[in-house]
Swiss-Prot record:
Disulfide bonds: none annotated. InterPro entries: BolA (IPR002634), BolA-like_sf (IPR036065), BolA/IbaG_stress_morph_reg (IPR050961). It comes from Haemophilus influenzae (strain ATCC 51907 / DSM 11121 / KW20 / Rd). This is Uncharacterized protein HI_1082. It comes from the Bacteria. Belongs to the BolA/IbaG family.
């Protein structure tokens, strides 16, 4: 599965400021920047982010997904500290 497709699915279905996907061979990770999602419990965050991607788990296009969530403010701070683009 292409990284851009994962990003686009999440952008189209969730209220997020930014999303970044990485990985290959059905093992992916996403960084989701959203005040709304970051405010949820960790379990709710996972459920919310997994939901639009579930069809791709069923087909095997995605086997594993790691999730990191940030508020907009925390992402700005961490990105500056870690020199993310």
């Amino acid at each position: 599965m292409e990284l851009q497709k994962i990003e686009q699915i999440l952008k189209d279905t969730l209220n997020i400021a930014e999303v970044y996907a990485q990985g290959e061979n059905a093992h992916f990770g996403v960084i989701v920047v959203s005040d709304e999602i970051a405010a949820l419990s960790r379990v709710k965050q996972q459920q919310t982010i997994y939901a639009p991607l579930m069809p791709y788990f069923s087909t095997g296009e995605i086997h594993a997904l790691t999730i990191k969530t940030y508020t907009v403010e925390k992402w700005k701070r961490d990105r500056a500290l870690n020199q993310f683009n």
